[in-house]
Design a protein with these regions (language model features):
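Glycine-enriched, solvent-exposed interface loops adjoining structured elements
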Residues: 1-102, 107, 113-325
Length: 325
């Protein structure tokens, strides 16, 4: 048996488009699709994928992210151009200071860096930020130009005030900061000792009914407001101590856009055919496809999409049924 021993097959944006147009008889395999038609089809493909995201897609678009808390801050805006620091958890290094910091410090020194799995790491992060809990209780975010196995170099902006030996430090790259999420699936509070506590996700009406929204303590509730440009996390009560640094969340995101011909879909490859047939269904209206063909394409497209939504996009987890008392 002559097997390939490879499992890296994928498709590009233009592969999906050309296959979809063939399904409705709009082109042959040897045809060159005009750029204007490719552009129109790419627009339909992007809107189609975004619509699917609104329906609850998808397991592979979920990530564990960390929101760094500021003492006394109630509202955190995340997304492009925002000032809150919400970062992919697997991109964060942490350590503890072995040398105290002052406002004159240009570098920080830690015993060693660890990743989120508590494994020692020494990879240079490059440009990013160091998050340092100062003696004042404020979480200070300082730009860094580079990191080593035991420290990092500030990028012209030193800490705002002192930080003692033993203070916790987190480091991460600029590119690991998240874009606007679609929804929050779960949230937990994490303290410096590694202990966690669940945070209740509440709706807007319940949040509005909370009295004294600036009450301080350990956050127990959070409202997620997705907005259009920058999403907002509203926590209650607001963090007030050096004990709680983070809220760890499972977030769901949009898949990447199809911006260029060679872009691959941010989907498992088993979704390729569903993308092709559903794009064909969308494009059949624009190409004047006859009703019979359009109906057949629609039936196949809907079937392929529903099968994957019902089977491939589900977690492997046990379901327990119990008799009501």
């Amino acid at each position: 048996v002559a097997l390939s021993a490879s499992k890296n097959f994928t498709v590009t944006r233009d592969d999906i488009i050309t296959m979809a147009l063939r399904k409705i008889g709009a082109n042959d395999a040897a045809d060159v699709i005009p750029a204007t038609e490719l552009s129109a089809a790419a627009l339909s493909l992007n809107t189609l994928v975004k619509e699917w995201t609104g329906e609850g897609l998808a397991l592979w678009l979920r990530r564990t992210c960390v929101l760094f808390l500021q003492s006394g801050q109630q509202r955190y805006k995340v997304g492009s151009g925002t000032t809150a620091f919400c970062v992919n958890q697997d991109s964060i290094y942490y350590g503890t200071l072995t040398t105290a910091l002052t406002t004159a410090s240009t570098t920080l020194v830690v015993t060693t860096w660890y990743d989120y799995q508590d494994k020692v790491v020494s990879t240079n992060l490059g440009t990013g930020y160091a998050a340092i809990r100062l003696d004042s209780g404020v979480m200070d975010f300082c730009p860094i130009t580079a990191s080593s196995a035991t420290g990092a170099t500030f990028s012209g902006t030193p800490v705002d005030s002192a930080a003692a030996i033993g203070a916790k430090v987190y480091a991460f790259t600029t590119t690991s900061m998240i874009t606007r999420p679609v929804r929050v699936l779960s949230a937990t509070r994490l303290n410096n000792n590694g202990n966690t506590a669940e945070i209740s996700l509440i709706g807007r009406a319940d949040y509005d009914l909370l009295s004294q929204k600036n009450s301080s303590g350990n956050p127990t509730q959070m409202h997620f407001d997705p907005q259009l440009d920058a999403a907002q996390f509203l926590v209650w009560p607001v963090a007030n101590s050096t004990d709680t640094n983070q809220i760890v969340m499972t977030l769901e995101f949009y898949p990447d856009d199809f911006d260029a011909a060679a872009n691959n879909p941010e989907f498992p490859i088993e979704w390729a055919n569903a993308l092709v047939w559903n794009l064909a269904m969308e494009m059949s209206f624009e190409y004047g496809t006859d009703v019979r063909t359009r109906t057949q394409v629609a039936q196949i497209a809907i079937s392929k999409k529903n099968i994957l939504f019902d089977t491939a996009d589900r977690e492997n987890a046990s379901v327990t049924f119990a008799v009501s008392q």
